[in-house]
Amino acid sequence: EGSGFISKAIGGSHSKDHVIERYLDVARYLGAKVDSLDDVEFPMPDLSKETASVQHKLQEAGWQGGDYVVIVPGARWWTKEWPVEHYIELAKKLTADGTAVVLAGGPDDAVKGQKIAEGTASSLVIDLTGQTSLRELAALIKGCSFYISADTGPLHFAAALKKPLVAMYGPTKADRTGPYGSKNSTVLLSPAKCAGCLKKKCDNWHCMHDITPEMVY
């Protein structure tokens, strides 16, 4: 996406590997010293102000303190999204165990967040979709005990913050855009034969449907 605007292509030894490794090839070309991929870190900015803001929003929404799981139900391509009914079933399982669930994401995720919250019908579900800035979203994820989503941007916040996480992949490929460098991640690949097609449109959407709530839970 956007690669068509590049005026000079730089090909490195990782041209078919994870996108971060490709970016590091560009960094090497520009003179940066990258000794080992094992040394790659993703430092985050000071989020103390945003942490206080997020905790206030959580408390206003009924959070009683303690651990919470963050679920981000949206993705840039609709084909990458896990079905809302699957999220509802998962949230019911989590809240039945007494686990607080915080739904998060941008304004485009608000309808999905509302449906999941209403479908779960539990006071342990807090819907903050569309109610945080990007930095507040990072702070929210920093404070969580666990993170769950499909292939979407906030997933990489969770990986950078070294959070335990579950990431679900259907039309996209985890070896290309998966949670990089995370030792606490569980990547669930769709069992569908068409998985990894990289299509933004689909007639059946089997791949994400075939990842069941039981597999995630």
What are these regions (language model features)?
Residues E1-Y217:
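Catalytic machinery of carbohydrate-active enzymes
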